[in-house]
């Protein structure tokens, strides 16, 4: 799990992605995140994107897939601290209409 750091406390799973998310890394990150989510069964999953400077469409797929996974187990899913470059991609994709984004990027509408 070299691309992830995680903390599980008070039924909250915080997963920090380390490095860029592209088609080369997304599969490994997805598999490791799913394992953590299904093993811990948290009520809240926080995906920390503060260390991600680049994300392509594979990253959007990763986010949407983990959102769906969390819905399936009854957990809430939030993105926290996205870097400015990632915030722009999230904004263009309209991700804030599906899930909460805290810190870094905010929907000011």
Q: Language-model features: where?
A:
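ABC-family nucleotide-binding domains
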Residues: 56
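STAS-like cytosolic regulatory interaction modules
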Residues: 1-53, 68-109
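Histidine-anchored nucleotide/phosphate-binding helix
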Residues: 63-66
